[in-house]
């Protein structure tokens, strides 16, 4: 569509229209997509533009919302790919995505004296393995640690 108003950077404004299901009419992406879907659409665009885009830092907030399995692996692969040209910050709850990160941080909230505070801790490699194990099944045991280690080693090998 065409905007007739002028903005600080001109009068061009872009809207993406997509059909998310066979037989459905195209609708404006910003009106029908969830936050996770918007992040994945941005990832797709940034992947295509990775070699020409000068944006130094890309932030993806919960890009893994509503996905798992092969879709999560594909997102992890694309994040890893664009991280070669950009600094990527990604908030994730999926082991597949956490496993490909060069650095992992654990963010936690606590209540002290009726005040909520947030803390962040950079994880060392063993802590990364343990956290990937925890988010993969809710517990840390021999099986989940082996799985987490396999995911991390797959990342290191690629």
Model-derived features: positions:
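Short loop/turn elements that form and flank the Walker-type P-loop nucleotide-binding site
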Residues: 10-12, 52-54, 83-85
């Amino acid at each position: 569509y065409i905007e007739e108003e002028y903005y600080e950077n001109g009068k061009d404004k872009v809207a993406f229209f997509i059909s998310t299901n066979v037989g459905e009419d195209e609708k404006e992406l910003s009106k029908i997509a969830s936050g996770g879907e918007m992040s994945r659409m941005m990832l797709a665009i940034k992947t295509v533009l990775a070699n020409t885009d000068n944006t130094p830092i890309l932030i993806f907030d919960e890009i893994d919302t509503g996905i798992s399995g092969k879709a999560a692996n594909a997102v992890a692969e694309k994040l890893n790919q664009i991280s070669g040209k950009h600094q990527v910050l990604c908030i994730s709850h999926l082991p597949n995505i956490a496993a490909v990160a060069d650095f992992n941080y654990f963010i936690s909230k606590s209540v002290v004296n009726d005040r909520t505070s947030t803390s962040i801790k950079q994880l060392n490699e063993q802590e990364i393995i343990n956290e990937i194990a925890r988010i993969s099944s809710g517990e840390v045991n021999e099986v989940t640690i082996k799985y987490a280690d396999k995911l991390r080693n797959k990342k290191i090998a690629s």
